[in-house]
Swiss-Prot record:
Species: Xenopus tropicalis
This protein's name: Lariat debranching enzyme
Regulation: Active in presence of diverse metals including Fe(2+), Zn(2+), Mn(2+). Also activated by Ca(2+). Binds two metal cations in two adjacent alpha and beta metal-binding pockets.
Function: Cleaves the 2'-5' phosphodiester linkage at the branch point of excised lariat intron RNA and converts them into linear molecules that can be subsequently degraded, thereby facilitating ribonucleotide turnover. Linked to its role in pre-mRNA processing mechanism, may also participate in retrovirus replication and have an antiviral cell-intrinsic defense function.
Leader sequence segment: none
A GO CC term assigned to this protein in UniProt: nucleus
EC supergroup of this enzyme: hydrolase
Single Gene Ontology BP annotation: mRNA processing
Keyword hit for Kinase: no
Region (Disordered): 388-457, 470-534
Disulphide connectivity of cysteines: none
Length: 534
């Protein structure tokens, strides 16, 4: 089946769906599934915007609320993970995953699902070492600190994913696995993003947690975003089992949805034609969730996961066939994920904006039902219970410096002509001074992007299909990995009905008939400096 993979969404759902539909018509093909690698921005109303780690002057409603309200329906089944620019309060309602809108599914803090027999896993957020061992203690309204820590990866999710033993077809993370750039062409990467050089040379770029998962899970495909550049790599894993064929992972990072950027790619993935055309639970993952329910931490205190070091009576929480059968019984032998989306808050009304709306802590019925069926802990219900009983010590003051104060209506205006911009057009400034120990990118993000274009009127070129082989050139080779992808896919033909495959970019200078012209609504958001670390 054909899977469309998208990098950073940044709320551009309409543009992404329109692009796919245009390409389906142009190429006479059908995309079966869309995967988004973070920064999805499922913003339902003004309160959600205040829970997104973006400066107030750059916040814009976008159009997700139309999918949430039912005014629009996602034309393609969409699965996404969270990034570092999200409506964290909404995603927090669904820690184990769930429908954020009809036909749009969030994986959760971490999760595994199946579609047509293809096993798809993912982990949300980005890595920051100072929050890694904490629990999920944050709750809205967030403070200036918790609005960022809410999307930081926790060790419980990594520990759970490391219990998996069955083969993984696709895995998604927002930030890159650390060291993956050594398996692709670093020369071309640094030509595009020279401010990564020191971190690449020091091997500090990317997430060590994701790198750990890559070595353990060894999926066939790994997709990421976050760094706003397309990069392909091929990693051959090692095996200690004699006679066993080593696994290999095709890694692909994609850009964000902007003009002249490679933000979308079609991947042909083998599937089981006998499997139903719906999302299904993964029994092994559910068994791991149930086995590890007592390891949950809802405070900001640090918490170590069990290890085989003589200090823990149990450290292996992997799923046995018996536990998977028990899970199947709990589900009534129906592993189809129910389409039980429900609205949990009022939707944005452009005719009656509520700028003083503040996000509240909500327990989502989807999570309640899921936990009841499997005997799991509803994190939000547990936090609320402890708050009501007065026996929870969050230690991080959610009320002090709350970002949920009333704001002037002008902050949501689409007129951005007066906004100041930095010399780097790529990024969104978070305006904080958090430490840079994990990724250390902020001081270099002031450099201009070599491929930026300010054009606002665009249409689209054709799409590239990821080839079966992603041979990686050395740093000294003339052609990079991406160049080889170009050569394998861009053979131009002249006969009628033939297709010319070129990188998918949102172009400003293509005016052929049949193109879809799209005008940017929020260009100024991406003309400001972004502290990617947060």
């Amino acid at each position: 089946m054909k899977i469309a993979v998208e990098g950073c969404c940044h709320g551009e759902l309409d543009k992404i769906y329109e692009t796919i539909q245009f390409l389906e018509k142009k190429e006479n093909t059908k995309v079966d599934l869309l995967l988004c690698c973070g920064d999805f921005q499922a913003v339902r109303n003004e309160g959600d915007m205040k829970c997104m780690a973006v400066p107030q002057k750059y916040r814009q409603m976008q159009t997700f609320y139309k999918y949430y309200s039912g005014e629009k329906l996602a034309p393609i089944l969409t699965i996404f993970i969270g990034g570092n620019h999200e409506a964290s309060n909404y995603l927090q309602e669904l820690p184990y995953g769930g429908w954020v809108a009809p036909n749009i599914y969030y994986v959760g803090y971490a999760g595994v699902v199946k579609y047509r027999g293809v096993r798809i896993g993912g982990i949300s957020g980005i890595f920051k070492s100072h929050d890694y061992r904490k629990g999920h203690f944050e709750r809205p309204p967030y403070s200036k600190d918790t609005v960022r820590s809410a999307y930081h990866v926790r060790n419980i999710e990594v520990f759970r994913l490391k219990q998996l033993k069955e083969p993984m077809d696709i895995f998604m993370s927002h930030d890159w696995p650390r060291s993956i750039y050594h398996y692709g062409n670093k020369k071309q990467l640094l030509k595009k993003k020279d401010f990564f050089r020191q971190e690449v040379e020091n091997n500090t770029l990317g997430s060590p947690a994701a790198s750990e998962l890559l070595l353990h899970i060894q999926p066939s495909y790994w997709f990421s975003a976050h760094l706003h550049v397309k990069f392909a790599a091929f990693m051959q894993h090692q095996t200690n089992v004699e006679g066993e064929i080593p696994k290999a992972t095709k890694f692909l990072a994609l850009d964000k949805c902007l003009p002249h950027r490679e933000f979308l790619q079609i991947v042909d993935v083998e599937h089981d034609p006998g499997k139903p055309d719906c999302l299904e639970y993964d029994l092994e993952w559910l068994a791991v969730l149930k086995a590890t329910k007592d390891l949950l931490n809802i405070t900001s205190k640090t918490w170590n996961m069990p290890e085989n070091n003589g200090l823990h009576s149990r450290w292996d929480f992997s799923a046995s066939e018996k536990t998977k059968r028990e899970i199947l019984d709990d589900l009534g032998h129906d592993i189809k994920i129910p389409c039980n989306f429900c609205m949990t808050t009022a939707c944005y009304d452009p005719n009656n904006p509520q700028y003083k709306r503040v996000a509240t802590h909500i327990v989502n019925p989807q999570t309640t039902e899921f936990c009841a069926r499997l005997g799991l802990v509803d994190l939000n219900a547990k936090i609320r219970q402890h708050e009501e009983e007065g026996d929870i010590d969050i230690t991080e003051d959610n009320e002090a410096d709350s970002i949920g104060s009333a704001e002037d209506p002008g902050e949501y205006s689409t007129d951005t002509s007066l906004l100041s911009t930095s010399i780097n057009p790529d990024e969104i400034a978070l305006e904080d001074d958090d430490d840079q120990e994990d990724e250390g990118m902020a001081e270099k993000l002031g450099e201009p992007s070599p491929d930026y274009t300010p054009d606002l009127s665009i249409n689209f070129s054709n799409i590239r299909v990821l080839p079966d082989s992603m041979a990686v050139s050395s740093d000294d080779a003339t052609d990079s990995t991406n160049d080889e992808l170009d050569r394998s896919e861009s053979s131009q033909t002249e006969g009628e009905g033939k297709q010319s495959n070129r990188p998918l970019k949102r172009m400003s200078n293509e005016n052929g008939s049949g193109g879809v012209k799209i005008k940017r609504r929020n260009q100024a958001i991406y003309q400001a400096k972004d502290d990617e670390d947060e």
